[in-house]
Amino acid sequence: MAKQRIGITVKLFGGIDLDSGFSEYDPDKGLDLATSEGIRLAKVLKTAGVKVNADTVYFVNGAKAGPRVKMKDGDTVFCMKPLAGG
């Protein structure tokens, strides 16, 4: 049986869009992806062309997530670099 197609939105913050080479990235819209049900976060990011590193933090629908989280239809992924200031 074929896996169902799902839609996922990926939003990039802290310059990840520029690091990944997205010169026309719209932070209000993010990146919309159509992919297979059950795909893991790491594969979503690779498929989208998002450059990842050990410092990047990920959230799925507002909850912190790791690379092995399975995605569902309608999920929104937020990718952020650590911020510092003071």
Model-inferred region functions:
Residues 1-85:
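Ubiquitin-like/PB1-type beta-grasp interaction modules and other compact soluble beta-rich domains
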